[in-house]
Amino acid sequence: MTAASTSKWGLITNVVNSIVGVSVLTMPFCFKQCGIVLGALLLVFCSWMTHQSCMFLVKSASLSKRRTYAGLAFHAYGKAGKMLVETSMIGLMLGSCITFYVVIGDLGSNFFAPLLGLQVTRTVRVFLLFAVSLFIVLPLSLQRNMMASIQSFSAMALLFYTVFMFVIVLSSLKHGLFSGQWLRQVSYIRWEGVFRCVPIFGMSFACQSQVLPTYDSLDEPSVKTMSSIFASSLNVVTAFYVMVGFFGYVSFTDATTGNVLIHFPSNPVTEMIRVGFVMSVAVGFPMMILPCRQALNTLLFEQQQKDGTFAAGGYMPPLRFKVLTLSVVFGTMVGGVMIPNVETILGFTGATMGSLICFICPALIYKKAHKNAPSAQVVLWVGLGILVVSTLTTLSVTEEAPLDLTQEARSGHRGDAEGAMKVEAARLSVQDPVVVVAEDSQEKLKPAEDKEVLEQAQIKGPVDVPGGEAPKEKQEAAQLDRPGQGIAVPMGEAHRHEPPIPHDKVVVDEGQDQEGPEEKKPPPRLPDEGDPAGRGQGAPPLPESEKEKQEPERGGEGKRPGQVLAVGETEHPQKVPEANGQPPVQPRKEDSRPGNRDPQPAAQARDSVELKALAADDGREPAQKAGGALWKPVESAAESDAGGKAGLPVQRPEAAEQREKKEAEQQGGDQAGSKLEAEIKKLVAEAGRAEMLDHAVLLQVIQEQQVQQKRLLDQQEKLLAVIEEQHKEIRQQRQEGEEDKPKPADVQPEPGVAVLRGQEEEAEHAGETLGDDPSQPLQPVLGAPRGRPAPSQDMGQHLPGEVKVLPGRDLADLPAGGSETEPQGAPIDLREDPKAAIKAAGAGKELVPGDLEAVHKAAPPEVPKSPEKQVAKAVAGQRQDVFGEGSEERKETGKEAMAPGADTQKEAVQPLVGAEAKDTKSRQSGPTKAPVQTQAKFHPEPQAIFDTGQGSHPEVRSEAPRAVHIPPEEQHKGKGGAAIQEAKQRPDPNSGPKLAVPAGQKPENAKPNRDLKVQAGSDLRRRRRDLASHPEQELAPKDGVIISFNSLPNVQVNDLRSALDTQLRQAAGAALQVVHSRQIKQLSGDLEEA
């Protein structure tokens, strides 16, 4: 229990030290702005809101198991939430560091300059800041494990703050706390200063960046423990702030400035306090730099992990660590040199980044997990109000503060602490006339005159202030009141740029010459102001530079005059070419967007084509088409990407800038109305800023999509390269194996090959059409369904006859293969003239039926045939197979064996008449069939199956039924062909898909088949004479042979038993089909003989 309480109080000490900072110096000033009662109430309210927001973070962390602020935001709102939190955290820490430097410059220069006998000048201040940052802040910040050394300073810093509070109390006693004079000099409730003080109060309690590290450091993390720790810490800090604010305001009343230590007289105690404050602030730097450096690291360098988290606390490389630390330390030092007073930077940072980090983001994160959270609603809306109203109030009220103090510093008016106090008092009294503080940004001329009187009354008091200051103050008052016509921001800039008149005119003209034509004079430019602004609303800005310039602009309009001009300069080069007749920039950008979006449809088209190519049963034509479609969109997408990026003009802004410079030189003398035009320009530019930011966001999203599309394109190009390599290897293997092509085989695919029958038919005919048409070896025929090649005409000749002969044939398959072929009626005419068919049979008696496969194209019908031609045709038919070469040749040999029976039948002779006339064409087309193989590279396995069917399908159905007295192995081959037909007509549900034998196995399977081919050719005439003598009705006595001892079918199975069972099933189906079709053909043959 004691250890737990000790660790708890240690954590409370750390939290209090992280909360209390230089903002305590501004508490008397805030009490002066709001009044004592209202100031105390606002402090209590901000303390409650800070506690609520800390609990929001703790509860969200316990639910989502995330332990970083950015991780919580990413979990709730994705990458946008993470970016918002990181940028806000960076801004808050940078603002705190700048505040530290301002305090060091104010207090340290007032302490060290008198010791060294120097005047408190700007040079002394800059030198002091550089020395402190180089010798104190930088070494502390470069330590990697700073927390151990920082904790040792926590107790010391708290002791110092306690001493500081007692000094404030003693000062109030000295200034008559009990005399009661202050009761009439102080104010109790002043609503005018609420929106100026609330952001300072909110930032004074800012500890959200320390919530999750503290939660992680607990031995037993729990929401209840965290709530008690932060409640105790915030109560201590609230009491401390109220005491310092009250006693400081009572001590100095209306003379209270933003840094209350400036008012203290120079004595050893106050000097010790000042030095102690400087040291505590310098030592507290690492507390601000640590989270700022981590946020910069994750924002700029760290990538998102696979689990969606970011390595926020990971190891940082030494070079990056040093570069980030140096950038933060010296960058904020420059800011401390440029911004002279504490309340300005504290108010602005608290109103913008402080409200986001302290109130808005925690409330949004908590609302994401808990829908009904009234406290989150309150915190959210108060934070939004601070963000909007307080930012405007702070900027409008303090616009003149940098002018006063910088001019005083440049002129050497800040002789010592007393002189600085008087200047501050004079400036504060100007801001605070009798209850007119809220109207500072819109004061009229009479209040300006009152200001004059007040200034003269209070500034003439100090001896150090020269007498020429009153006219200066008068001039400033007159100039600063001119924007009181409604806008406070632009005239501050005009005043700031006014002394060098020619330079001022050039700058303003650069910001105003939107239209760019040289003929236009400044007076007509006023009515045209709306036109460029309207165009500016529609024109999407450049994504990076524009957004970077707009973000600070939206946060504080008019805070930085150069930013408005910079935005104008970036906008105008885009608009000037429009007025001069050049192609406008805006359409270029809008045209580039379709180019940017183009890769997405292109990639979708490629995906669909590739899926079709992978899923298509015919592996030749769709794959080739997919190849063409895949290559073209890659190029077009690359062109569109290049077009989308090159669409942004690169050289035109240069020409526009030159044109603007010329116009600025021409119009340099026209100064009438330049300031009023600057005001109008800024108003109009601000009006279009929101829409321009939307365009920028949209453009960024499109660019992210482009990156994703490019990745997809790269992957698809790699896939295509792999496919091309496979294609080349296949072609080489085919060329090597062409020597061993003429190989017979009796392989039958198992029945029920798992492919759609209509697509099989189309695949069967595709090779023949392409092989017989050498002029179009690789192009798909337009009429073919699904982009496949149209079937050949010889298939059209066979199929109508087979409709009569085979009742088991699926009629739906026939139109798919031969619906668009011309000579479908040829076999019917031949059937009507059986004598002509018999003549053709006598003339082509030696014809090998293997020619029937691809010989039936229309050609001069009188060309005779010879066995040499038949052999050439057989070789040509075998070239159509790519992976299934062995099976193709085996089937052709089977068809040759079946041919003698076909020659003896009248009806079977009829197709030979057309085939006889086409032998020469088949010989020509034989060599051209080799290119067909290139199309099968995408899907080799299905292609082998389809070529198998293609080689055996037509002839076996017509000739096999009359195979009488065929030797057993030849009879088996005929049955194998019928089995192929049966397999295509009736897929067996029990059998799996048949795959082709790999190319490496072809030579082994093909050698015995080549011997069979030679044997079959030698016995061809003898078999035909024997078969011619048998009667048509006689069946072969050796039909019982089902399984031959040739090589097993090309079925990829794991054991011999499965292969035998597959072959048995095929043979059984083939036998049934052969008997059935034989009876039907015998009946039709008898009818024709009669």
Curated annotation (Swiss-Prot):
Tissues and organs where the protein is expressed, per its UniProt entry: Expressed in neurons, astrocytes and epithelial cells scattered throughout the central nervous system structures including striatum, ependyma, cerebral cortex, hippocampus, hypothalamus, thalamus, pons, and cerebellum (at protein level). Highly expressed in paraventricular hypothalamic nucleus, suprachiasmatic nucleus, anterior hypothalamic area central part, in lateral ventricule and in dorsal 3rd ventricule (at protein level). Expressed in choroid plexus epithelial cells (at protein level).
Membrane topology: Multi-pass membrane protein
Protein keywords: Amino-acid transport, Membrane, Phosphoprotein, Transmembrane, Transmembrane helix, Transport
Keyword Lipid biosynthesis: no
Stretches with biased composition (Polar residues): 923-936
Membrane-crossing segments per the record: 9-31, 36-58, 84-104, 123-143, 153-173, 229-249, 272-292, 323-343, 345-365, 378-398
Chain positions found as Phosphoserine: S441, S608, S636, S887
Catalytic reaction equation(s): L-glutamate(out) = L-glutamate(in); L-glutamine(out) = L-glutamine(in); L-alanine(in) = L-alanine(out); L-serine(in) = L-serine(out)
Main location: membrane
Location of the region described as Disordered in the Swiss-Prot/TrEMBL record: 441-675, 729-831, 857-1037
Coiled-coil intervals: none
GO annotation, cellular component aspect: Golgi apparatus; membrane
Compositionally biased residues, Basic and acidic residues: 441-454, 493-508, 517-528, 544-560, 587-596, 607-623, 654-665, 729-744, 758-767, 954-973, 1004-1013, 1026-1037
Biological process annotations from GO: amino acid transport; bone development
Modified residues (Phosphothreonine): T769
Locations listed in the record: Membrane
Function noted in UniProt: Facilitates bidirectional transport of amino acids. May act as a glutamate sensor that regulates glutamate-glutamine cycle and mTOR signaling in the brain. The transport mechanism remains to be elucidated.
Family (UniProt): Belongs to the amino acid/polyamine transporter 2 family.
Full protein name: Solute carrier family 38 member 10
Lineage of origin: Eukaryota, Metazoa, Chordata, Craniata, Vertebrata
Gene designation: Slc38a10
